[in-house]
Amino acid sequence: SYRKANRSRLDSFTGIGDEKALEILQAVGKELGVETITDVHESHEPATVAKYVDHIQIPAFLCRQTELLLAAGETGKGVNIKKGQFLSPEAMKFPVEKVQSTGNNNVWVCERGVSFGYSDLIVDATAIHRLKQLGVPVIMDCTHSVQKPNKTEGVTGGDPSLIETIALSAMATGADGFFIETHPDPKSAKSDPHTMLQLDKLEGILTKAMNIRKALHA
């Protein structure tokens, strides 16, 4: 996110300023020749954010917000909708239809686990297959899905040792891509330090995932 709007505590880090953050995303895209994506949280944001990034992401907690989905769709950018931790895969049909109603068919859905009690998430092994029945690409959020939310200290916990397992199992069940938050020193990350993948582990996971993908399509 260019702005971390969804934080547990009032004093949690939320960003470095909207314009500065968006300019950094734009510069990264140009310098590395990659496409960029960021969250939006309110319906007035997509039109501005679309000037800086290639794709727009709808956070899981906001995946039913009609005006936000319509505003994202109207930009014409790719829209990645994260599945709420409270929704079934089949219920994602409706957010997808909201974006598509704008004439924008470049829509993806993103699995990120389902709430299990108050302080845990689990990943349903059937979710990827069920989401693919919607006829849109399916992304697996491999890092937020290992969260341990609602900690008393107001900082979300997690188990990053499970990231590789989540990623490889998702690829084996048909995922089209990954969402992975990574950092060279996760403990010093401004957000989600307990679920960040250490950067030097990313290549190995992606190599294994691509081998699985090749085997599936052999």
Label the model's feature ranges.
Residues 15-17, 33-42, 54-67, 78-89, ...:
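Catalytic beta/alpha-barrel core
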Residues 152-218:
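C-terminal alpha-helical cap/extension of soluble enzyme domains
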